[in-house]
Amino acid sequence: MMTLKPGYLTLPQLRQIAREHVALQLDPASHAAIDACAQAVADIAAKGEPAYGINTGFGRLASTHIPHDQLELLQRNLVLSHAVGVGEPMSRPVVRLLIALKLSSLGRGHSGIRREVMEALITLYNADVLPVIPVKGSVGASGDLAPLAHMSATLLGVGEVFAKGERMPATEGLALVGLKPLTLQAKEGLALLNGTQASTALALYNMFAIEDLYRTALVSGALSVDAAMGSVKPFDARIHELRGHQGQIDAAGAYRSLLQGSGINVSHADCDKVQDPYSLRCQPQVMGACLDQMRHAANVLLLEANAVSDNPLIFPDTGEVLSGGNFHAEPVAFAADNLALAAAEIGALAERRIALLIDATLSGLPPFLVRDGGVNSGFMIAHVTAAALASENKTLAHPASVDSLPTSANQEDHVSMATFAARKLGDIAENTANILSIELLAAAQGVDLRAPHKTSPSLQKVMDAVRKDVAHYELDHYFAPDIAAVTRLVQDGTIAKLSPLSFASEQ
């Protein structure tokens, strides 16, 4: 059981929520603030004075006053009319994150929602009865309205849920946990709908995957250094301290650790090669820049995970209702776009190392990493696949946040496109995982071909993990299953765990 303390979620907690179903309970210390804010909204509604989101229309219809006897209908209509998402459902881990983030935001006591509504959401979450939320339909301002409307509709008994391995009507899902459809009171529908939780959940989920890919790329890159008989001198700490970028310093340290004790490296210590190609030599500089961007994105997304991104905001101590723009997901969009650049570059650099390894002139290995070339093509077309994926990533990495289309009759005239920025990270991550699996296979093949010289003790663990599932490439054979097998090792974190570097989300 995880105690959710609104405004104090940590990256390790968020990673745990993404990776497994852990039961949640609301920190009792948050109850007073939630109840006070709900009462403040009830008092405002009772007075009948115009207050946006409580007794007015929405967006361009904000100047329309709604009679007191229609306030519940207003909230129901808001939820149903905004549930317009399209496309495939969000994955269950993303929905878990989305709900946890929404609970944290509501729990800070500035949204005006009753605790019983939050507890109903927690009951569904804990029973693993999760809303079916289409992944497309949000522009990231005013918040993630469509996705959150689908989440909210479940509480009304509308829409669908995933439960017990099945997709079923929301009414059946509610019945499974002993709940009846709720009637939302003043402001509650808007409190549930308004916020950046969908884009932030998508960005966090994909960021955790990219963190694992980063650690994997350190490992595969180090293995490629040994396979190509590259030098370890470019990883000397003195070089990187003179430049001063922390990511570069940390990446170089990881390469030194991984390559420490390599017999292959010792075997060519006195060779006449002066400098390696950039894809080997400049790994700390490139991967360090990626690391700095990823750490910054993690800080931004953690802030957003703990933020109140509702509108309007209620301040119970003064009774004020303040309209602002915390729903605008520009910080999330920028963070996701920066993660996209980093993930694409990780894959691009790995593709270049694969190209180096299969080129006999550069690597000194047999052409395409196979003996008896000609009758055997070896890794020739595996590299083509890596090139195709790296190229695709370059298009996917185009920033979504540079685009904006006005909506709601120009009331919402600038939007963030954060949800698309976060969503396409998943495609980039999948491509990069496959590129890294091809590099791991190529580098392992190269290390095998350096026998009797051996790689380092740290990298031998990588060799063992790869060779447990995929044998040395002797002759041409049906190659796709080999790539798929190593991709599974990449995506389940098996290879990442062999990296000496870790992220804040893992601590």
Swiss-Prot record:
Keyword Lyase in annotation: yes
EC number(s) reported in the record: 4.3.1.3
Keyword line: Cytoplasm, Histidine metabolism, Lyase
Signal peptide extent: none
Cellular component per GO, a single term: cytoplasm
Subcellular location: Cytoplasm
Top EC class for this record: lyase
Tree of life domain: Bacteria
PTM (free text): Contains an active site 4-methylidene-imidazol-5-one (MIO), which is formed autocatalytically by cyclization and dehydration of residues Ala-Ser-Gly.
Pathway assignment: Amino-acid degradation; L-histidine degradation into L-glutamate; N-formimidoyl-L-glutamate from L-histidine: step 1/3
Record Pfam families: Lyase_aromatic
PROSITE patterns: PAL_HISTIDASE
Reactions the enzyme catalyzes: L-histidine = trans-urocanate + NH4(+)
GO molecular function, a single term: histidine ammonia-lyase activity
Family to which this protein belongs: Belongs to the PAL/histidase family.
Protein name, entry field: Histidine ammonia-lyase
UniProt organism field: Paraburkholderia phytofirmans (strain DSM 17436 / LMG 22146 / PsJN)
